[in-house]
């Protein structure tokens, strides 16, 4: 019975590490995709990124046992992805243009500026939804592979942060914040990974890191539950919308001249 319990505990600890990689990349990617109202298949992205997290966990835990195994593994994966980019360059180009235009529309709405949308000779028969989904999947799976290579035995939290933070921050440029679920999930994962970054050696420290990560993740989820009671999604969305309203008000005020300001002061004071 004790052996079975140990196996179960080991499975939970190892699986929690896979979930950290998966949820970290997926939530960061969805912060951009959902907040900018991109057209994509969310369920397919979730399924393939989760499958990729499991595959790369198995791959890199094996490659780590060989000299320069991770390096050769990353080179092989990069070459494979380059081949996919060449093979589906038409669909990917359409996906890039669609994603970029989604960002530009939100940016223009937020800043009140006029920017020309991207255009190109569309020879791709696939739908914009398929092309954007393909783009998100390739980006997500590649970052899952990259982060997995520096995560399980000797963790490099800087790789995770460098690969995911841009997707969380990008919507802010257009006055948007990732949707409630994705933004909160990313914060939980980021805090958990940063909190265990100093434990990098093998064996005992690795097991301690896994246990500490599980404790931190549980603590963050409890705090998130409390946060949910005080700031439910509806209130969160209202406050996010106020960012654009406040910014637009400031822009309007900056265009007032002295005469307009004096007229406004006389009217209200």
Label each residue range with its predicted role.
Residues 1-269:
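Helix-boundary/low-complexity linker signature
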């Amino acid at each position: 019975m004790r052996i079975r319990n140990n196996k179960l505990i080991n499975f939970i600890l190892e699986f929690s590490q896979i979930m950290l990689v998966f949820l970290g990349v997926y939530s960061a990617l969805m912060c951009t995709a959902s907040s900018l109202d991109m057209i994509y298949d969310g369920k397919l992205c979730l399924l393939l990124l989760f499958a990729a997290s499991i595959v790369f966990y198995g791959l890199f835990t094996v490659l780590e046992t060989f000299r320069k195994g991770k390096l050769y593994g990353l080179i092989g994966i990069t070459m494979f992805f380059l081949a996919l980019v060449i093979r589906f360059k038409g669909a990917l180009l359409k996906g890039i243009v669609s994603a970029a235009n989604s960002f530009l529309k939100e940016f223009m709405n937020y800043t009140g500026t006029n920017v020309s949308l991207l255009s190109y000779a569309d020879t791709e028969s696939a739908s914009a939804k398929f092309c954007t989904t393909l783009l998100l999947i390739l980006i997500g799976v590649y970052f899952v592979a990259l982060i997995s290579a520096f995560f399980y035995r000797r963790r490099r939290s800087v790789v995770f942060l460098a690969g995911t933070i841009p997707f969380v921050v990008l919507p802010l440029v257009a006055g948007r914040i990732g949707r409630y679920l994705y933004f909160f999930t990313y914060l939980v994962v980021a805090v958990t990974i940063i909190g265990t970054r100093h434990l990098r050696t093998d064996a005992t420290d690795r097991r301690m890191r896994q246990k500490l990560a599980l404790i931190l993740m549980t603590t963050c989820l409890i705090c998130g539950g409390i946060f949910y009671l005080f700031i439910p999604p509806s209130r969160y969305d209202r406050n996010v919308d106020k960012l654009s309203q406040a910014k637009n008000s400031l822009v309007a005020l900056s265009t007032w001249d002295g005469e307009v300001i004096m007229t406004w002061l006389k009217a209200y004071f």
